[in-house]
């Protein structure tokens, strides 16, 4: 086996009542320009959308809604454009695995000049990410 180092700084939090207490500080420690990535209608039906946007009202939220199950590369490209054009500081994923996976690629794609599909297919290398 080759020597390697793996470091995963993704911060995933679960639990009752944690959102109200922890979300703002967890996000704002990275900056004020936030890309808020989420999926379908359940986030709004559940009231979670209103909670998140209310808690982060003093930050500059840019939204990327509608992340599909097994996200389409066009959604990732749209996210890459937003993180670059809006000079996003932090990507906040609220949803399931597809939303989280999309957000991870989008965060990596901010500093990548090529097509984010390269990052998915392991042809691209980025040394920086959000």
Predicted segments with their positions:
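Glycine/threonine-rich beta-strand-loop-alpha-helix active-site module
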Residues: 74-130
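ATP/NTP phosphate-donor binding region
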Residues: 1-90
